[in-house]
UniProtKB/Swiss-Prot annotation:
This is Small ribosomal subunit protein uS7. It comes from Haemophilus influenzae (strain ATCC 51907 / DSM 11121 / KW20 / Rd). SUPFAM superfamilies: Ribosomal protein S7. Pfam families: Ribosomal_S7 (PF00177). InterPro entries: Ribosomal_uS7, Ribosomal_uS7_bac/org-type, Ribosomal_uS7_CS, Ribosomal_uS7_dom, Ribosomal_uS7_dom_sf.
Amino acid sequence: MPRRRSVEARKILPDPKFGSELLAKFINVIMVDGKKSVAESIVYGALETLAQRTGKEPLEAFEVALENVRPTVEVKSRRVGGSTYQVPVEVRPVRRNALGMRWIVEAARKRGDKSMALRLANELSDASDNKGAAVKKREDVHRMAEANKAFAHYRW
């Protein structure tokens, strides 16, 4: 633990097209090897496809999809007297967004469609309909937390 003041989080610049900090963060999650322009073209292409498919604004459709993937509780391992318990804890808002984005990207990369933009569009579309691999991941995490509710008093 540092003894000095805590470091404030860096301010992230909003994305150039929609002016959303959340979308800028998502572009950074998609980015591989520092190729931001490639990541931006993938995300914007996916959002265009998603907007045509749903008939909503691209940013609104993205936020609905992300909201359906965000976890509210997760389990953390806690060692008590020689045995390890999976203790359910509430997820902080920043981590909630980060996990949701990471799960969407992982699920999109595992899909078998042609381009990454198409895979991402399909995963976001599934997430906004409350189905798909990313939503399944959230359900699994919630199920684990529910199953280990008895150990909630070990919270720290």
